[in-house]
Amino acid sequence: MTNDFHHITVLLHETVDMLDIKPDGIYVDATLGGAGHSEYLLSQLGPDGHLYAFDQDQKAIDNAHIRLKKYVDTGQVTFIKDNFRNLSSNLKALGVSEINGICYDLGVSSPQLDERERGFSYKQDAPLDMRMNREQSLTAYDVVNTYSYHDLVRIFFKYGEDKFSKQIARKIEQVRAEKPISTTTELAEIIKSSKSAKELKKKGHPAKQIFQAIRIEVNDELGAADESIQQAMDLLAVDGRISVITFHSLEDRLTKQLFKEASTVEVPKGLPFIPDDLQPKMELVNRKPILPSQEELEANNRAHSAKLRVARRIR
């Protein structure tokens, strides 16, 4: 593995094992990242099995070509450089209309966070960027410097759930009227200066939620996840499974809701039984999310907020 793309995979065995791998099946890793899940999944496949791996970051794909070389050489893995919201169209273009399982590791990968110039981290000084796909035009700089006060408040509340959203948006408006806000450090200081002394004493970095909100907005993370997970459930063969790792309450709430909608049915009044065409297409494999073990939590700080939800196609 290349040194500049080091990544400790979260819930590695749980995520893949819960897919109940069929050696000759067709599988998808919707979030290739450091290729940890892909590597373990490929190790479970026989010569007739195949993995399709998505990532919109070329660096991740370049790294995976090296890490997964033996599977590349046997033709068992196909890399797709695109946002996973285009899951269905990419697979259908490759002649794939049905899959046996798919896994998601949502959020930003550790290498992206650690790469200073990507501008994801409030801990390192860097240009405001936060794009997972470097080819897209919208950046964190654009959000911070061009969004109206009301739009900033909206995304800070909606995606950051920060109770100081109005104060932070107002302060951003004041500062950018003098000169553009161009670095992560500048933004982090503005956020800190907008919060009360009592709030600043709380555990965790005061800029964390706002940086999360801007990152979600720049990459339309929740919209992409919503579209992709729905497509994934439609692509699953009967008995196929979907595993989703989330890292914050918004992702987890979305996943839980999508799984609930697909695994329950509103029975019209007066119907003595549920007709076949109204039966749910999915069932929950685990009602409560699977959490990392104590051993994993001690070994990998990033695992602390991780939750794994799994569902199975039943018709």
Curated annotation (Swiss-Prot):
E.C. code: 2.1.1.199
Signal peptide positions on this chain: none
This protein's record includes keyword Secreted: no
Any one GO biological process = rRNA base methylation
Q: Which UniProt keywords apply?
A: Cytoplasm, Methyltransferase, rRNA processing, S-adenosyl-L-methionine, Transferase
In which family does this protein belong, per the annotation? Answer: Belongs to the methyltransferase superfamily. RsmH family.
User: What this chain does, per the record?
Assistant: Specifically methylates the N4 position of cytidine in position 1402 (C1402) of 16S rRNA.
Q: What is this protein called?
A: Ribosomal RNA small subunit methyltransferase H
Q: Which organism is it from?
A: Streptococcus agalactiae serotype III (strain NEM316)
Encoding gene, per UniProt annotation: rsmH
